[in-house]
Amino acid sequence: MSTYHHGDLRAALLRAAGKILEEKGIAGLSLREAARQAEVSHNAPYRHFADRESLLAALAAEGFAILSQDLEAAGREMGAAYVGFALQHPQRFRLMFGGLLPIAKYEDLRVSAGRAYQALVELMKSHKEIADPEAAAAAAWSLVHGLSHLLLDGHFAQEQREEFVKQVLGAVRFAAAAQRSA
């Protein structure tokens, strides 16, 4: 194992930790294992992360930043982008939304989580006829978030997934349209 890092140690540790997270889950991630995979000394992570929780918080913040970009790029197809993110990054998704981390303790995490949700609120605000964009965003998020968890937890066979996703996203659109006409 090398004690020298080339480039950005923090980024190298986050890459290694992200790989471990997706392979072994939250329980399988340690600072020591991230250091080993990043090929640095076992003490090197402490230059950037006070403890395992702060490493997990950084991974979650990074996940919310990626999710925000995906949602903003998706426009009206945010629901599909959200489900897609969950299915592509199941362990990171569980970390982000699992209640393990005290969001208020980590500024980067709080800001990046807020940005992801705000993208949905802004989409609802773009529909002037929606009387309460915050409530509409909360309702849409609840449906899509629940769908994501059901899919991750294996409650639907692989061959049923696509049709079920279409049905739920259609229900979200229908509910938004109903609120506009009410």
Name these PLM-found stretches.
Residues S142-E159, F174-S181:
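Amphipathic C-terminal alpha-helical segment
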Residues I103-I130, E134-A139, E163-F174:
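Amphipathic alpha-helical packing segments from all-alpha helical-bundle domains
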Residues G84, Q88-S126, H149, D153-Q158:
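Short secondary-structure transition hinges
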Residues L9-A17, A34, L59-G63, L67:
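Generic hydrophobic, amphipathic alpha-helix propensity
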Residues M1-D8, R180-A182:
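N-terminal intrinsically disordered/low-complexity leader segments
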Residues Q69-R92, A140:
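Hydrophobic alpha-helical connector segments
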Residues A61-M78, E107-V111, L120-E122:
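Amphipathic alpha-helical linker/stalk segments
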Residues A12, A16, I20-S54:
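Helix-turn-helix
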